[in-house]
Swiss-Prot record:
This is Interleukin-22b. The keyword Secreted applies. It comes from the Eukaryota. Pfam families: IL22 (PF14565). PANTHER family: INTERLEUKIN-22. Cytokine that contributes to the inflammatory response in vivo. SUPFAM superfamilies: 4-helical cytokines (SSF47266).
Length: 179
């Protein structure tokens, strides 16, 4: 009887172990098929604060008056070309980070008082998107962002003015893509 009980116990343990391995294998296989959680989302409340919305749009309006190059748009249809809707927030994260690091921070002593309020707000959005990544091919995104960066660099200070003058478009595009 004891031998039969031991035999059943080993058989049961073997079945249990095999079942666990099967479950782990199925879980791992399913995990490969699921997209990685990208955390590419912003809360709508970020875009519903009248004061900062007003300051952002006022900064863009003030600076756009100094923009002499009205033939070029940095944020528009071309920027989103070839980028699926689900990846547009990641694209806008890249544009936001470039705008902050290469345009706004070097120009932060200008266009006061708006700049001192808008830069921390946009930095907060950038921090909220810090874990935003895509798991697929980002070739079109990188190409479009590279084109935007090259345009700003080619235009020099005029390109920086244009980027600041389009902060309203950046704001709206972030809201549309990330909320």
């Amino acid at each position: 009887m004891a031998v039969l009980q031991k035999s059943m116990s080993f058989s049961l343990m073997g079945t249990l172990a095999a079942s666990c391995l099967l479950l782990i294998a199925l879980w791992a296989q399913e995990a490969n098929a699921l997209p990685i959680n990208t955390r590419c989302k912003l809360e709508v409340s970020n875009f519903q604060q009248p004061y900062i919305v007003n300051r952002t749009f006022m900064l863009a309006k003030e600076v756009s008056l100094a923009d002499n190059n009205t033939d070029v748009w940095l944020i528009g249809e071309k920027l989103f070309r070839g980028v699926s809707a689900k990846d547009q927030c990641y694209l806008m994260k890249q544009v936001l980070n470039f705008t902050l690091e290469d345009v706004l921070l070097p120009q932060s002593d200008r266009f006061q008082p708006y700049m001192q309020e808008v830069v921390p707000f946009l930095t907060k959005l950038s921090n909220q998107l810090s874990s935003c990544h895509i798991s697929g091919d980002d070739q079109n995104i990188q190409k479009n962002v590279r084109r935007l960066k090259e345009t700003v660099k080619k235009l020099g200070e005029s390109g920086e003015i244009k980027a600041i003058g389009e902060l309203d478009l950046l704001f709206m595009s972030l809201r549309n893509a990330c909320v």
